[in-house]
Design a protein with these regions (language model features):
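Sec/Tat signal peptide C-region and signal peptidase I cleavage site
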Residues: 13-17
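Beta-strand-rich domain onsets/edges
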Residues: 18-35, 117-181, 186-192, 203-206, ...
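Short acidic/polar inter-strand loop motif in beta-rich domains
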Residues: 97-106, 239-245
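Short amphipathic beta-strand segments in non-cytosolic proteins
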Residues: 58-68, 196-212
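Start-of-domain marker
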Residues: 18-73
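Short beta-strand/loop motifs in extracellular/secreted proteins, especially
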Residues: 56-58, 193-195, 231
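Bacterial N-terminal signal peptides
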Residues: 1-12
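Glycine-centered loop-to-beta-strand initiation motif
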Residues: 77-80, 89, 214-229
Length: 267
């Protein structure tokens, strides 16, 4: 399982590289506990908690034992998620944003984003479309999941039909961490082959290590995991917006961000 570890590179990434993920103080809880989770935006697995604003959310729900529950929150709530599961199992929290947009005034900043996320031959495509290399407008969408162990934490993650998403093919709360955790990255419910997966590994003391992997032909990668650590996986794709789809403000490019968070119990 080859990993490429980064160090100071991630200490000062610009805002275009920010991830959005679902985070909490404890990814393992009992069924009668109230679970509180933040929507966080930042980098290097550190960021600010985002308030609940309905206008920014396309869907936000949690799934446990084959039942789906809509998130109940008030405008401005921090944390954005609060729920008491009431039974044991593997709880999956799913968040999908409405589209937002930003403008890159010059090509260098946009290209840094392209290179960081390994998004392919975007410059060649951009030029071929007859677009200028200034004032590049990008629309972006977030598709974030969190997998929480409740009690005995029996169960499995599954596909939720997001435009892009990670699916855990194992259970990090019950499986042997020495075997690694198999995950799959999807786009429109199909495997993303040879996709870059960015792995953020947070130790109990808050130290974060960052590494990269690539998915295989089936969109699958095996992640090295350690007891007592929390993980954020991130994968981004960039596509030409569909001109026939009213998908938010007009843009030259559209990015889709998949993220999943989970933890591994202490040994």
């Amino acid at each position: 399982m080859p990993l490429v570890t980064f160090f100071a590179f991630f200490a000062a990434q610009p805002s275009f590289a920010h991830e959005l993920w679902i985070d909490g103080q404890n990814f393992q809880a009992q069924s009668d506990e109230t679970i509180r989770l933040d929507l966080r935006n930042g980098e290097n697995f550190e960021g600010s908690a985002q308030a609940y604003f309905k206008s920014r959310i396309k869907s936000f729900y949690w799934f446990l034992n084959q039942e789906t529950h809509q998130v109940e929150a008030r405008m401005g709530d921090i944390p954005a998620f609060s729920a008491t599961p009431g039974e044991d199992g593997l709880m999956v929290v799913v968040y999908e944003s409405t589209p937002s947009s930003l403008t890159y005034r010059d090509w260098a900043k946009f290209d840094a984003f392209i290179q960081h996320k390994d998004l392919g031959p975007i410059e060649e495509m951009h030029v071929a479309r007859g677009l200028l290399k200034t004032d590049i407008k990008e629309a972006y969408h977030r598709y974030s999941k969190a997998v929480i162990g409740i009690g005995a934490a029996q169960g499995a993650d599954q596909r939720f039909g997001l435009e892009t998403e990670f699916v855990l093919l194992g259970n990090p709360y019950r499986d042997d961490p020495a075997q690694g955790l198999k995950v799959q990255i999807l786009y429109r419910d199909a495997p993303r082959a040879d996709a870059q997966i960015e792995i953020f590994e947070r130790a109990s003391d808050g130290t974060v290590n960052v590494s990269l992997m690539r998915s295989n032909a089936e969109g699958v990668a095996v992640i090295d995991i350690k007891p007592g650590h929390t993980y954020l996986l991130d994968a981004v794709l960039l596509r030409v917006p569909d001109p026939n789809t009213a998908n938010g403000p007009p843009a030259h490019w559209e990015s889709l961000w998949a993220a999943v968070t989970f933890a591994v119990p202490e040994g």
